[in-house]
C-alpha cells in the first residue's frame, strides 16, 4: 500500500514544511514543473506526496482520501465535525502561528470581555430589535465559543466573503471572529481583541486520518510523526 502525505501547495507554510521534513530526514523530491502537484521522497517508495491548499488538506483528511497532511489546527477544528473521532494531531510543528479571536470596534470603550459582550448582545436585541451580527469564516468555532463556552445566545453569524476585518466599518456586521498573527490588520481597521477573546491559538500541525490501514503503513506514519515532533 502507499501512504499519501498532503503538504501545503504554496507560500511560507509550504517552505517551512519542506524544510522541516528535510531536517527530519525526509527530503521532498520536488517536481521540476510547479504546476505538477505530486512528489516523492528519495528512498521511500511507500510514501506519495501531494500538494493541496491548507483548507483542502483538512477536507481530504475528513474524507479519508489522504492518510496524513500538514495544515492549520484552526482548519481542522473548523472543517471537521467531531474532529477528534476523525483525525489525530500527531505533531504540532512550531510554525504558522496565528490566533482565532473575537474583535470589536475600538470605540466600544466599555467592552473588554466576553461578559461585556453578552450585555451588548442583550442590549442590541432590546434597543435595535435585532441580534448582534458577527462576521466570520469560522462558523463552528464561533458557535462553540459563544454558545457553549460563554452561554451567549443572542447573536447572528453573517457570512464573510471578503476581508472579514472590514465588515464592521462597512456596516455588514457589528463584530468579527477572525484569524490574526500580528494584530496589525485588526488595528488598521480600528478593532481590538477582547481580553478573554482568544478562541484558539493555532499553528501548523501534522494531522493523521483515523482509519484502518496495514501495519506497515501505520509504522511509516508513526516514524514520520516522531521525526518531525518539536
UniProtKB/Swiss-Prot annotation:
It catalyses: 1-(5-phospho-beta-D-ribosyl)-ATP + diphosphate = 5-phospho-alpha-D-ribose 1-diphosphate + ATP. Pfam families: HisG (PF01634). It is found in: Cytoplasm. One of its GO terms (cellular component) is cytoplasm. The keyword Aminoacyl-tRNA synthetase does not apply. It comes from the Bacteria. It is an enzyme of class 2 (transferase). Keywords: Amino-acid biosynthesis, ATP-binding, Cytoplasm, Glycosyltransferase, Histidine biosynthesis, Nucleotide-binding, Transferase. InterPro entries: ATP_PRibTrfase_cat, ATP_PRibTrfase_CS, ATP_PRibTrfase_HisG. Its EC number is 2.4.2.17. One of its GO terms (molecular function) is ATP phosphoribosyltransferase activity. Lacks the C-terminal regulatory region which is replaced by HisZ. Catalyzes the condensation of ATP and 5-phosphoribose 1-diphosphate to form N'-(5'-phosphoribosyl)-ATP (PR-ATP). Has a crucial role in the pathway because the rate of histidine biosynthesis seems to be controlled primarily by regulation of HisG enzymatic activity. Belongs to the ATP phosphoribosyltransferase family. Short subfamily. This is ATP phosphoribosyltransferase.
Amino acid at each position: 500500500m502507499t501512504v499519501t502525505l498532503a503538504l501545503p501547495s504554496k507560500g511560507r507554510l509550504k517552505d517551512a514544511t519542506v524544510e522541516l521534513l528535510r531536517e527530519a530526514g525526509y527530503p521532498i523530491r520536488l517536481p521540476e514543473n510547479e504546476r505538477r502537484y505530486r512528489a516523492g521522497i528519495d528512498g521511500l517508495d511507500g510514501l506519495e506526496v501531494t500538494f493541496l491548499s491548507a483548507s483542502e488538506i483538512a477536507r481530504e483528511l475528513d474524507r479519508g482520501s489522504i492518510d496524513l497532511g500538514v495544515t492549520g489546527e484552526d482548519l481542522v477544528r473548523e472543517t471537521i465535525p467531531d474532529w477528534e473521532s476523525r483525525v489525530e494531531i500527531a505533531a504540532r510543528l512550531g510554525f504558522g502561528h496565528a490566533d482565532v479571536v473575537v474583535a470589536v470596534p475600538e470605540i466600544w470603550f466599555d467592552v473588554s470581555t466576553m461578559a461585556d459582550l453578552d450585555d451588548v448582545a442583550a442590549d442590541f436585541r432590546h434597543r435595535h430589535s435585532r441580534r448582534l451580527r458577527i462576521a466570520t469564516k469560522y462558523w463552528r468555532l464561533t458557535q462553540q465559543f459563544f454558545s457553549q463556552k460563554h452561554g451567549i445566545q443572542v447573536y447572528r453569524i453573517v457570512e464573510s466573503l471578503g476581508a472579514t476585518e472590514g465588515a464592521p466599518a462597512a456596516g455588514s456586521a457589528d463584530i468579527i471572529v477572525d484569524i490574526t498573527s500580528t494584530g496589525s490588520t485588526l488595528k488598521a481597521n480600528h478593532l481590538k481583541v477582547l481580553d478573554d477573546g482568544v478562541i484558539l491559538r493555532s499553528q501548523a500541525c501534522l494531522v493523521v486520518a483515523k482509519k484502518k490501514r496495514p501495519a506497515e503503513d501505520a509504522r511509516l506514519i508513526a516514524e514520520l510523526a516522531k521525526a518531525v515532533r518539536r
